[in-house]
Amino acid sequence: MFEVTTIDAHVAGGAVRLVTAGLPQLTASSLEERQQLLSERAGPVLAALAREPRGHSGVVVVVLTEGDTPDADAGMLLFRSSGAAAACGHAIIGATGLAITRGVLTPRRHGTVRYDTLAGRLTATSIVLAGSGPVPVRYTGPAATVLQPNMPVNIGRRALRTDVVWSGTELVAIVDAEAAGVPLVSSRALELQRAGADVIRHLDESIRLTHPDTGAHLSVALAVFIGPAPESGMDIRSGTVRADGTVEHTPSAEATAAIAAVLSAMGLMPIGRRLVHQGLLGTTLFATILAMGDAEGRPTVDVEIGGEAWPTGDHVFRFEEADPLLSRD
């Protein structure tokens, strides 16, 4: 038997699990190599932390390592139930809030953590307040840009339009929920899942998009259905479907950045304006455009995403070598 300890939090309802002990030590020269080694040596354990009975499809497991660059405070590796991930906004917010308040890491600059991730540099800022409760965190990452506006897409017999956006970390397709006939309520998640799968499949089969910086081929990671938020003080409500079929009932951070990029491209979101984005649970994240730029003639925006890390528990997970769930694919 062996044990793995974690600290858990949720961010707008998205579960984040920060590993604090129990995984093998990693000696490798790059973040990519550390991820590969960790997957090889502890892949079943990481999968077990993110899957039932210890987890669920929405859990993101965070492992902090050394960074690749001299000014990084830490490297960040992420694992979902479907496997390794390059970046996740909920994980950045949750892990930062937990790591700073619990002393897991001590950043060089008070309240600011610079992460090296497989998606690039992400910088998070947290103001730790006295007492218990949520920890507010904001972060910025690589610039977002609209790659293909107003792309045709089919959902069943409906001919729709979608904006395909590079959020800075993932490829996102944004669709009007009313036009798609998809209600933005948790009780209709199955319909949302089916529509999202149609959007992702159609786009991946019909167009080829590349990373704006590296030129690498990109597949659609998220289908985001948007509509007006029913409550005052909210700007947009959404339901998000991941390529692995997971329905995110929270306001996805990557979707938030992508929506901000689209609104900016339409002239509806100037620098400094705050966007309040509501998910199916009614919880929120916010986005603020800090700067605008240009990449090969395409407008880009630097987006700050903010939310709150709510600590939910400290855990000691026990693993028996004979547990059949440790060996499943």
Where do the model's predicted regions map?
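A glycine-rich beta-to-alpha transition motif near the start of alpha/beta enzyme domains, typified by
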Residues: 1-152, 176-329
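Catalytic core of DAGKc-family lipid kinases
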Residues: 147, 160-162
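Internal, non-catalytic "lid/hinge" segments that mediate substrate recognition, gating
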Residues: 153-157
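Internal alpha/beta core interface subdomains
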Residues: 163, 167-182
